[in-house]
Every structure is written in structure tokens, then in C-alpha cells.
Regions:
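Internal mixed beta-strand/loop scaffold within catalytic domains of large alpha/beta enzymes
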Residues: 144-251
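Intrinsically disordered, low-complexity regions enriched in serine, threonine, proline
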Residues: 9-10, 193, 338
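Bacterial N-terminal signal peptides
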Residues: 18-30
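Hydrophobic alpha-helical segments, especially transmembrane helices
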Residues: 12-14, 18, 178, 342
Length: 422
């Protein structure tokens, strides 16, 4: 039987296919001039080895602080990403395919403003133009846009498992998440935990996410209400439209900034109905206890708007107090094979007798499961275990040659990270 994102590296043929799809998106953005802001609305600190970037204020203020505080990290991620032999992208392909594709991407004005400010912050931090040797030219604003669209072009393999109620030792939810991708040392070495605090008048929720320097979207995170978001690539249905695709990391940021317990499913639906994805994605949302509705849900989404507005919801069975997500659709599109990681996580959940107190899910057990579902040949860039009721994230970042779940985890208090110190 065929494998779906099995424990083998993806072939480079996916890159070419994704690049073709990437060209089918909408809006032109000029390169901004350098400008200054009166203050830096951010801080960069460390909890043990984990860098914590805290940003607050408007998109412009947050973007400038991001660039000012992490400029060298962003430059390293971008330049070494292009130079990686694992991706098969050459200079001509980048300049002739990816950059023209960016001119057709649809980016919300607030995100464009934030990226422009980030570019200005990087320039201010280095006090000079930034030469990218691989491209034989200076860094441009459009390159920052490319970083934030990179996962729309080159796919990731990830795993998540969520358990709650009778499946956990204390009845409270636990979520484990591995983020697996190509081995690119500069990206592994320049991961960040980012805490974002929007202005109260914005109506947006504060959140904490984990990703690479330069990314303003969200692939792994928890918001101030305890909503947990994890994303996973999947093989979706072919798009029914040819333009107007949104970078999915920015779409998922919209989700985490606007989703609350009690209305979570509707909140996510409202965002996805306004955002068209050009690729297949699984978006898993887990909700703290005490709310009406499901404890977790997976949204299987792609660009086929003729089928259920572009996404299909997958809920846990009524008898189950767990939900698993890897890299394939299970409802929207018939699975074409097996996924070893999904099967392993499913077997582990089924082995638990919810009527006994033995062998139930704990934070420690989630970590052991994450160790078992790393993808050989790739690297697990980050692993996170979430406790949404307590608003706690246990975060482990990969060290070169050592997958994230095998590295020392740091416990972070999300509520504390999202406070502005007086």
C-alpha cells in the first residue's frame, strides 16, 4: 500500500509542483524606503537556551521591533535557506519564478505594513544595506515576503495528538506537536518563541507562537484564551480558482488572533471563508475545557471552493476523547495509503483504557510519543506540549543533530509572556 508522508523525505518533485501553484495567486508591492520609528516596541530575552521575542503595539511598531531586535537572525534564515542543497532552488529559479509569483500574492494591508516595518528595522539594526551573496544583490522587502510564503512552496511533515477528559491523568487536555522539515542548520539555529500583544482597540487576541526568525505568521501556537493551533501539510484537492490565494501562515495567524472558547469552530470558519488556500493543509484546533462544543477539531482545507467553501471539518468520534493529525486528509479526500506516524499515535490512544487510572496521557507520555514520530531523514525543528487549561507551553528546539523531542524542554507561562510589564 502506498504511504502518505511516511517516514521518508519528500521528493524534490513536490517543490516544482508547488512553485507552479504558487504562481497562481494577486497584488503588487513596491519596495519600501527606510524609515524610522520613535521607539522599539519589543524585547529579546532568553529562558535557558530558548529565545523569547516579545512584541507589542501596532503592526508597524511590532514589525520594526522584530527587524531591529533579530535582524541578523532573519538574514541568516533567508540567505542559508536559499543556499540549502536540500531544497533544490537555484538563483535563477528564485528570481524568475518565486519573486514574480510574489507579485501576485494576496497580502492583507496590516501584514504588508508589518513586513515593510520589519525591513526598515533590519536596515536600522545593521546601519547598512544587506548583501545576499547567493543572489549577488541586496536584500529587498520582497525577500521578506518570500520567507513568509516559503511553506506555501516547500512542504512540511508534522504530527499532532490531542487528548482530554477520560484519556488524561487529570482530565485536562494535553496536545503534543512535532514540526518536521528539511535539515537547514541556519533555520534550526534561528528559531524563536514570539509573544505578540496587539493594541486593545484592535480586537485581536494576544498569542505565543514558535517558528523561525522573520516569520510573522503562525504554525504552532496558543492564544491568551488557551486556544491551541497546529498546522500540517496535506495533499489537497486541486484549486478551483487561479488567483487570490493567501499565504497559509498568515491565514492561521488570523485564526489564532480571533478564536475563543465557546465560539471556536465558528471563529475558524469565518476566517477560512475569507481566505483561499492554494495548497492542502490540516489545521488542528484544541479548546480548553468548560466550553460548549468539541474539545478539538481538524479543518481539512485547500483551494477547491466548489466543495464546502474550501474546507471540511473533522471532529473526534463521540466515543473518543482524542484527535490525531498528520499529513493527509481523512474526510475531504480519501486517504490513498497509510501514514506510519498516524497509525502509531492511533494505536497508542487505543491502548488506553479510559475506565482505569493506568497508563493515561500525561505530559511525560506525550513527550515519549513525540520521540516515536520524528521523520527519519528530516529534522524535527521544534516540539511543543501544550496544557491549554493552565496556559502552559513546554517547548523544545532542535539542536544540530538532535531532534527537538530529545532536547531539553523549557516550560513557558503563556499568560506571563503576554503581560506588559509596567
Amino acid at each position: 500500500m502506498a504511504r502518505i508522508f511516511s517516514n521518508e523525505p519528500l521528493k524534490r518533485r513536490f517543490i516544482g509542483k508547488a512553485l507552479v501553484s504558487f504562481m497562481l495567486c494577486a497584488a503588487v508591492f513596491p519596495i519600501p524606503d527606510l524609515f524610522s520609528l520613535p521607539q522599539v516596541n519589543g524585547s529579546l530575552t532568553y529562558v535557558e537556551k530558548i529565545p523569547i521575542l516579545k512584541l507589542w503595539g501596532t503592526p508597524k511598531e511590532q514589525g520594526f521591533a522584530y527587524g531591529m531586535l533579530t535582524g541578523p537572525k532573519i538574514i541568516a534564515v533567508f540567505s542559508k535557506f536559499l543556499e540549502s542543497n536540500n531544497l533544490g532552488i537555484n538563483k535563477n529559479q528564485y528570481e524568475s519564478t518565486i519573486i514574480p509569483g510574489l507579485s501576485r500574492m494576496k497580502i492583507e494591508p496590516a501584514y504588508e505594513e508589518e513586513l515593510r516595518a520589519m525591513f526598515a528595522g533590519i536596515r536600522a539594526s545593521t546601519k547598512e544595506n544587506i548583501h545576499i551573496s547567493f543572489l549577488k544583490r541586496e536584500l529587498k522587502y520582497t525577500d521578506l515576503l518570500a520567507i513568509n510564503c516559503l511553506n506555501d512552496m516547500i512542504r512540511m511533515g508534522c504530527s499532532s495528538v490531542s487528548a482530554w477528559g477520560k484519556m488524561t491523568s487529570d482530565g485536562l487536555p494535553r496536545i503534543g506537536r512535532n514540526n518536521d522539515w528539511h535539515q537547514i542548520p541556519a533555520m534550526i539555529e534561528n528559531q524563536l518563541v514570539v509573544a505578540r500583544i496587539p493594541p486593545p482597540e484592535s480586537g485581536k487576541l494576544a498569542f505565543v507562537s514558535v517558528s523561525w526568525a522573520g516569520i510573522i505568521g503562525c504554525i504552532t501556537g496558543m492564544n491568551e484564551k488557551g486556544i491551541v493551533l497546529t498546522s500540517h501539510d496535506a495533499s489537497g484537492l486541486s484549486p478551483s480558482v487561479r488567483t487570490g490565494f493567501y499565504p497559509y501562515m498568515l491565514t492561521f495567524r488570523d485564526v489564532i488572533e480571533s478564536t475563543s472558547p465557546g465560539t471556536a469552530v465558528k471563529n475558524v470558519e469565518d476566517v477560512l471563508k475569507r481566505r483561499v488556500s492554494g495548497i492542502g493543509k490540516n489545521l488542528m484546533i484544541t479548546i480548553p475545557t468548560g466550553s460548549d462544543g468539541p474539545a478539538a477539531v481538524v479543518f481539512e482545507l485547500d483551494g477547491d471552493l466548489t466543495k464546502e467553501s474550501g474546507f471540511t471539518k473533522r471532529f473526534p468520534r463521540e466515543s473518543d476523547s482524542y484527535l490525531i493529525c498528520t499529513n493527509h486528509f481523512r474526510i475531504r479526500k480519501e486517504p490513498s495509503g497509510t501514514c506510519e506516524r498516524y497509525a502509531l499515535l492511533l494505536e497508542s490512544m487505543k491502548s488506553i483504557d479510559p475506565n482505569t487510572a493506568v497508563n493515561k496521557v500525561t505530559t511525560k507520555r506525550i513527550w515519549e510519543l513525540l520521540k516515536q514520530v520524528v521523520i527519519p531523514g528530516w529534522r524535527t525543528h521544534h516540539s511543543v506540549v501544550f496544557e491549554p487549561d493552565k496556559k502552559i507551553m513546554h517547548v523544545a528546539l532542535e539542536e544540530i543533530g538532535k531532534d527537538a523531542p530529545f532536547c531539553q524542554a523549557v516550560t513557558l507561562d503563556v499568560s506571563d509572556l503576554l503581560k506588559l510589564k509596567k
